[in-house]
Amino acid sequence: MSTNFSVPEPTPQLVKVAESAKEASISLGQSTNKQRCEALTEMANALNDNADEILKANVQDLERSEKEGLNKSLLSRLQLTKTKLKGCIDGVLKVSNLADPIGKRQLHRELDENLILERVTVPLGVLGVIFESRPDALIQIASLAVRSGNGALLKGGSEAKDTNQSIMDSLDKGLRKSNVGSGALSLLTTRQESLGLLRLDKFVNLIIPRGSNELVQFIQENTRIPVLGHADGICHLYVDNSVDIDKAISIALDSKIQYPAACNAIETLLIHEDVAEMFLKKGLPIFSSEGVTLKGDTKSQALGVKNKADESDWSKEYLDLILSIKIVRNVNEAIEHIRKYSSRHTEAIVTEDKMVAEKFLSSVDSAGVYHNCSTRFADGFRYGFGAEVGISTQTLPPRGPVGLEGLVTYRYYLRGDGDLVKDFASGDRSFSHIDLPL
């Protein structure tokens, strides 16, 4: 999305779509767990039945986008292979097997005799989702929206317009076969609609951007609706001096090359000076054979890293087979570097020293902080959340990979029998505040 556009008032047509989504979301939020699970099954079946059409549409999008010069990392995200589509369909079914997030009683308290307070989870209402390139995000978020009883207005990038339309046609077909209906999900197709969406604070309860730093920042600066997301994925891996070199190299490789366009891939590798020579002597040929371009500080260049890293590289999200390397004196310097340049997404340490590991885990303020494992584990599916709506790097919850729990809020129910505050204010009655079983 270009940031040169001012945010216009939503068109009457868009307002009508939003009103319909709001009304449908109320009905969806009151549906039973069984009805929503059946709807997800029908959605998965429809996607499977129309898989060939979806993949054909994706080829059209890829060919057009390549001709238009879409960069390599976005082309990678745009591509929907048969295997990836099958994984998405399986993900829809797995979401249906997750525990119902609606109607969970979080608090049950007697304020006084026959005056009972409850706090119960309820859907947010309507989600506004804006995403670039990744058509699989449409499937993930649509399934989570239905499972959590929320409506959704979904706007994908123009580069994926044919794929997204084919997917939405399939989802709509599945919903029409269920008892839930299709009005809760709507696909927005124009830039004007995506901009107008930001002004729909009367109808939309949460904006979820999935895309570039530029996109997320623009949305955060131009809407009064709460935004769930992260602008950057500048992730770090620190290799300590108390380390198994082979383990460290394999973790670094997985964190970078397993899917370099992902927001949880590392962009900077920090290495303790005591093991830097050993690590780079063994690791450089391996990184080179995998096609990774390395950029290093002066110390790492002296040990064989060919390209120089400048100041801007430490805060750059490459989303490609490029990795910055810096040699540090100790874990404290590594932590200071991360505090200065991290986007607070995911960081990891490789060390056999448990005390150093605990210091790192407790000192680094990111959504995910790992010990002896790849940063690529920062994912809702890998956490067992089912498909994720996104990753949040904000301090307030939800934080990190956000699944169903981030799509519900809560409501207080108080049931009494003619109870009046004046009776408590006068001292005629007093609060018991007894917690009851959930």
UniProtKB/Swiss-Prot annotation:
Pathway: Amino-acid biosynthesis; L-proline biosynthesis; L-glutamate 5-semialdehyde from L-glutamate: step 2/2. It is an enzyme of class 1 (oxidoreductase). Coiled coil: none annotated. The keyword Cytoplasm applies. One of its GO terms (molecular function) is NADP binding. It catalyses: L-glutamate 5-semialdehyde + phosphate + NADP(+) = L-glutamyl 5-phosphate + NADPH + H(+). InterPro entries: Ald_DH/histidinol_DH, Ald_DH_C, Ald_DH_N, Aldehyde_DH_dom, G-glutamylP_reductase_CS, Glu-5-SA_DH, GPR_dom. Its main location: cytoplasm. It is found in: Cytoplasm. Keywords: Amino-acid biosynthesis, Cytoplasm, NADP, Oxidoreductase, Proline biosynthesis. Its EC number is 1.2.1.41. PROSITE patterns: PROA. GO terms for biological process: L-proline biosynthetic process. GO terms for cellular component: cytoplasm. Gene3D superfamilies: Aldehyde Dehydrogenase, Chain A, domain 1 (3.40.605.10), Aldehyde Dehydrogenase, Chain A, domain 2 (3.40.309.10). Disulfide bonds: none annotated. Belongs to the gamma-glutamyl phosphate reductase family. Catalyzes the NADPH-dependent reduction of L-glutamate 5-phosphate into L-glutamate 5-semialdehyde and phosphate. The product spontaneously undergoes cyclization to form 1-pyrroline-5-carboxylate. This is Gamma-glutamyl phosphate reductase. It comes from Prochlorococcus marinus (strain NATL1A).
